[in-house]
Amino acid sequence: MSHQTGIQASEDVKDIFARARNGKYRLLKISIENEKLVIGSCRKPSDSWDQDYDSFVLPLLEDKQPCYVLFRLDSQNAQGYEWIFIAWSPDHSHVRQKMLYAATRATLKKEFGGGHIKDEMFGTVKEDVSLHGYKKYLLSQSSPAPLTAAEEELRQIKINEVQTDVSVDAKHQTLQGVAFPISQEAFQALEKLNNRQLNYVQLEIDIKNEIIILANTINTELKDLPKRIPKDAARYHFFLYKHSHEGDYLESIVFIYSMPGYTCSIRERMLYSSCKSPLLEIVERQLQMDIIRKIEIDNGDELTADFLYEEVHPKQHAHKQSFAKPKGPSGKRGIRRIIRGPAETEATTE
């Protein structure tokens, strides 16, 4: 992200992005050079998107160099043509390069326009992002299939090394609990919140299908926040807390886990509790979301303005505690010793 790497698109790159969004180009390859986003290659359409795909995309992917690829589909949404965003990070590239491209990924998407991006893919080998790989990706979105042990291991390696691929596959066990997959819609909403395009995201667990899905993204002011907390079901909430502190205007993301006591089933309580830590790990690591405070509540009535302010800015002790003198050993003390000065010693000798 821009606040992490400082890498942004120049005006020339933004102009090319604008022409691409209008349909002039089928493909853009973007690289990072001298701490700037640069266009490495542009291709105009020559056939339908699926006929162009492999011949356009695969030759541009280098074995030891990460890059981004934006590939235009023939379909359109309300904002214009839809695009596939490919984050290419080959296994043999340097770790520093992988981390740099991972940290700049959100910036590029924001500069291009996230509303134009229909699908996102991440790949370490060309098969991952080939036309066949894209079709497998679409199939997995409609009906997720369990990963094999080898696929699961590879996915974990990608997450640990690159910190950019979000779990949208199948559930897996972690040391902290059960990591259910996050729906694409929920992930996109969290990304918009992180980019300050939304101020509230509520997630719920689809227990039957074992997936975390989007509940709502209603625009929410602080006074409305208690109304967003269900009284009969658990939820995860991400709230953009806008406030002033010591003269500074702040926008802080707060995570709220609401569990209305025993009105929920035991299974629901266990699942929400087990999925909480893995969800936060994905959001903080993969989206680089800075969550300033994590709160657990029973009902929305607790979410007053004073409560939230004190949670985000805990009161400091007015006085520093003085160092406590160590206590002597318990029980009887030994014989008291008197240390004489030199003058006293000489007088005694005489």
From Swiss-Prot:
Keywords: Acetylation, Actin-binding, Cytoplasm, Cytoskeleton, Phosphoprotein, Repeat. It holds the Pfam family Cofilin_ADF. Residues 316-350 are annotated as: Disordered. It comes from the Eukaryota. Signal peptide: none annotated. InterPro entries: ADF-H (IPR002108), ADF-H/Gelsolin-like_dom_sf (IPR029006), Twinfilin (IPR028458). Residues 2-139, 177-313 form the ADF-H domain. The modification Phosphothreonine is found at residue 349. The modification Phosphoserine is found at residues 143, 277. One of its GO terms (biological process) is regulation of lamellipodium assembly. The modification N-acetylserine is found at residue 2. CDD domains: ADF_Twf-C_like, ADF_Twf-N_like. It is found in: Cytoplasm; Cytoplasm, Cytoskeleton. Transmembrane segments: none annotated. Belongs to the actin-binding proteins ADF family. Twinfilin subfamily. This is Twinfilin-1. It comes from Bos taurus (Bovine). The lineage of its organism: Eukaryota, Metazoa, Chordata, Craniata, Vertebrata.
